[in-house]
């Protein structure tokens, strides 16, 4: 991140969960909770299967989420 540039998102919490998917059944995963935009108080969650989790993968998925959905956050329709 460039000097003076504000962060777009802040990872708040990372924790393991058990979740249910109708196609796969019960599985273990890692929940990534992040605030976007920073300071807004809006929190979002991404679940990554436990086998796929690495800190780098979590960061990549948060960035991917922001690119895909971040543009509509806060828009008045």
Language-model regions, residue ranges each:
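N-terminal acidic leader/helix
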Residues: 2-40
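Acidic, low-complexity intrinsically disordered segments
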Residues: 2-8, 14, 40-77
């Amino acid at each position: 991140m460039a000097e003076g540039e504000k962060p777009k998102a802040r990872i708040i919490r990372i924790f393991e969960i058990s979740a249910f998917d109708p196609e796969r059944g019960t599985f273990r995963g890692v929940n990534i909770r992040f605030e976007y935009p920073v300071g807004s108080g809006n929190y979002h969650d991404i679940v990554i299967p436990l086998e796929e989790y690495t800190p780098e993968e979590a960061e990549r998925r948060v960035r991917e989420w922001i690119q895909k959905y971040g543009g509509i956050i806060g828009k008045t329709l």
